[in-house]
From Swiss-Prot:
InterPro entries: BRCT_dom, BRCT_dom_sf, DisA/LigA_HHH, DNA_ligase, DNA_ligase_AS, DNA_ligase_CS, DNAligase_adenylation, DNAligase_N
UniProt entry keywords in alphabetical sequence: DNA damage, DNA repair, DNA replication, Ligase, Magnesium, Manganese, Metal-binding, NAD, Zinc
UniProt-listed GO biological process terms: DNA repair; DNA replication
Organism: Streptococcus suis (strain 98HAH33)
GO cellular component, one term: cytosol
GO molecular function annotation: DNA binding; DNA ligase (NAD+) activity; metal ion binding
Pfam families: BRCT (PF00533), DNA_ligase_aden (PF01653), DNA_ligase_OB (PF03120), DNA_ligase_ZBD (PF03119), HHH_2 (PF12826), HHH_5 (PF14520), Nlig-Ia (PF22745)
Protein name according to UniProt: DNA ligase
BRCT domain: residues covered: 577-652
HAMAP family per the UniProt record, alphabetical: DNA_ligase_A
UniProt-annotated binding residues for Zn(2+): 395, 398, 413, 418
Superkingdom per UniProt: Bacteria
Matching NCBIfam families: dnlj, PRK07956.1
Amino acid sequence: MKTRISELVSVLNQYAKEYYQLDQPSVSDAEYDTLYRELVELETAHPELILPDSPTHRVGGKMLDGFEKYSHVYPLFSLQDAFSREELEAFDQRVRKEFPQATYICELKIDGLSISLTYEAGNLVVGATRGDGSVGENITENLKRVADVPLTLPEAVDITVRGECYMPKASFDRVNKQRQEAGEAEFVNPRNAAAGTLRQLDTGVVAQRGLATFLYQEASPSEATSQSQVLEKLDALGFVTNHEYCLAESIDDTWDFIEKIAERRDDLPYEIDGVVIKVNDLAIQEELGFTVKAPRWAVAYKFPAEEKEAEILSVDWTVGRTGVVTPTANLSPVQLAGTTVSRATLHNVDYIAEKDIRIGDTVIVYKAGDIIPAVLKVVDKYRKEQEIMPIPSHCPSCQSDLQHYEDEVALRCINPICPSQLMSKLEHFASRDAMNIAGLGSSIVEKLFGAGLVHDVADIYKLTVDDLLTLEGFKEKSANKLYQAIQTSKSNSAECLLFGLGIRHVGSKASKILVEKFGDLETLAFADQEAIASLEGLGQVIAKSLTTFFASEGAQQLLAELKEAKVNLTYLGQVVDENAALSGMTVVLTGKLERMKRNEAKAKLEALGANVAGSVSKKTNLVVAGTDAGSKLTKAQELGIEIKDEAWLESL
């Protein structure tokens, strides 16, 4: 019985690979179904014999309660965008300034959802979304229902891989036809369909929708020496990789590839929105490193956005949390990149003047970065007697005089008590990436502000249940729920609070770097500008913005009020002692460890102050080598780098 189940699992997985990955089925659907039904019957009779890679794991459904947060062991960085050949050439110049010999690999930018897959001893244990790059959602059960995601690997390896989950065009058409027949709203594009499917609580729906994947990165430490070798390894392990890539010696080569792909884009069976160009050599990648947000060794070229004509009907002016006044055009509705667009940004007053945009003009509209509708230019042939657009002289929120500084393109309201600015700051403070106060959205902020209950972020922590009950729409249950969410946020780590304060130029990544280094906001508030600027990935702009903010009397008062409200001001992540054994050292793990899992070894090294890198370079201080260590060990020996074994690591 056990042997027959094993045979069926093996042959059905092979048939599935032929069908889904190779598009070369060797048996009919009827033959597959017969074998599949036999396996189901045997597993039903003998559930103790069900194998982890059985294809029956992929079908059928169960209802999930929700998705838990998942902290990525290896962070997922976003990529710097490029929209022209000139921007690609600038990227190339930055790379070749340090590494004249660098070559590139060009891969298609799949328009889907970024995923991370983690395997232990060859078995899939976690499948997660990208989230903010540090924390995503655990969607393992749903990813198990994606036909080409391997449940087990041919080797008992510990590995974390990255890729894109997408909905092929054929699946998208089929799903939308079914939804149309059922009287349900159709998905606007394959990316939205894939995202919505992966967040389904009914796993059976995921199994039916025909999602697919392309894997492209080994996130855990790799024995490969190049990105092209990584793709070969992923292929060998049974992952689906995209073979539409090219190796390029120069930016001329990459541009040739981009132009050829652009011509074939509509004929591909899946949606793409660009081409990713990476330095192929992993050691050079390691040397180039990262900025706060993105790797310095890669860039994502985005194809020109779809453009449509629309008429500007009117213009709204709104004030953001930094006081910038932004114009937004109300348009005659147009279909653009799968959605109906009736509003588009006009950026700023300088842009309006430069393009001579007027109400009543017919303009070209596109989606900047395929996301934000924007006005590109005026269609001059339709210009009649439209008057020059009136530019506001007073803030649309508080009626204060607006400023237009010489070194800025935007109008700015500098009134520190401008209602729109204050409300926007409160919304930002409560947002998911900041203090994550569930239920405190824009409409509730507006009610709180209008009732005079809050004016700054410290006031949020002075709210009582009775205060909330005075607001329209609040009952005992909803008031208690929001109150508890506010109290819970007090225990967040300090990087959430720092980001929530909305200091100019200080994003979530920079916030974490800062509080990790200085330990708490009170220490950071008195930090020297040069000490801040010297931190990797930051610089003078962020440092000056921080020191200017904390030097103000208002900021000191705000910190005091937050502390009095018992809001945590301290970094709660792991703090490494500057005198730790490996403090400041770059360490590479290679080979197979006998007694420790690779993740455990990485965590221990980091706890000892090390920066664990994925490849050996001149910056590497130490290599920890297990058995069967390959090219990394050889390179370390050639460079004269100190080499230690697993026993040494255990002894620390």
